[in-house]
Amino acid sequence: MLAKRIIPCLDVRDGQVVKGVQFRNHEIIGDIVPLAKRYADEGADELVFYDITASSDGRVVDKSWVSRVAEVIDIPFCVAGGIKSLEDAAQILSFGADKISINSPALADPTLITRLADRFGVQCIVVGIDTWFDAETGKYHVNQYTGDETRTRVTQWETLDWVEEVQKRGAGEIVLNMMNQDGVRNGYDLQQLAKVRAVCHVPLIASGGAGTMEHFLEAFRDANVDGALAASVFHKQIINIGELKAYLAAQGVEIRVC
């Protein structure tokens, strides 16, 4: 069995790490490189960097910090933000990123997933899905351009359908960003994760809602996700990664202990 992964997420805007609640009202957390190094030193398995306004601004992720991050950490990292071409992806990978993640650009042009997978291999290609639960209809809908709350829009895709579509097109991994839970630290949406897990045959990463060590355990044990991504609990030092991993290992979760 592959070890479960603990993945700090760093949302980047204007060259700094920020964090919001339900993708709104972002506060500045700090500089990118020192935070990346801190998480690597604490025992993170991987890092994810989202340039959150790149797609809504119509630009590609700012690459100036990618090589600086690669110089100070020795764990895999993934970069996302406005990647719309093979050239964009090649540049980011050449600067030292191990994976690239696409979200809004994949919704705009689903063939991008296949072209990237064919060129760089499925192991490099992550698709991020920003999913919102509509309590009135009981359905999960995919959102686009979520980095800017004034431009966020609901797409025609229901989440489970899009999960199946991106796999057919070559996604090697899926990060499910559960917008209702984002930043509120009440736990991952286990019901939604279970529904997605049933149709997801590539590695699935849970994102949105971690507030306690138990929340990570629930995601691994009850929803059988491959990795758990979190931001505010790590940024605000509510949870230490080394202590989290020791706790999970004690609960019988297969994990790479620091």
UniProtKB/Swiss-Prot annotation:
Coiled coil: none annotated. Keywords: Amino-acid biosynthesis, Cytoplasm, Histidine biosynthesis, Lyase. Transmembrane segments: none annotated. It catalyses: 5-[(5-phospho-1-deoxy-D-ribulos-1-ylimino)methylamino]-1-(5-phospho-beta-D-ribosyl)imidazole-4-carboxamide + L-glutamine = D-erythro-1-(imidazol-4-yl)glycerol 3-phosphate + 5-amino-1-(5-phospho-beta-D-ribosyl)imidazole-4-carboxamide + L-glutamate + H(+). GO terms for molecular function: imidazoleglycerol-phosphate synthase activity; lyase activity. The active site is at D11, D130. The keyword Phosphoprotein does not apply. Its EC number is 4.3.2.10. The keyword Amino-acid biosynthesis applies. One of its GO terms (biological process) is L-histidine biosynthetic process. Pfam families: His_biosynth (PF00977). It is found in: Cytoplasm. One of its GO terms (cellular component) is cytoplasm. Pathway: Amino-acid biosynthesis; L-histidine biosynthesis; L-histidine from 5-phospho-alpha-D-ribose 1-diphosphate: step 5/9. Signal peptide: none annotated. Its main location: cytoplasm. IGPS catalyzes the conversion of PRFAR and glutamine to IGP, AICAR and glutamate. The HisF subunit catalyzes the cyclization activity that produces IGP and AICAR from PRFAR using the ammonia provided by the HisH subunit. Heterodimer of HisH and HisF. NCBIfam families: hisF. PANTHER family: IMIDAZOLE GLYCEROL PHOSPHATE SYNTHASE HISHF, IMIDAZOLE GLYCEROL PHOSPHATE SYNTHASE SUBUNIT HISF/H IGP SYNTHASE SUBUNIT HISF/H. Belongs to the HisA/HisF family. This is Imidazole glycerol phosphate synthase subunit HisF.
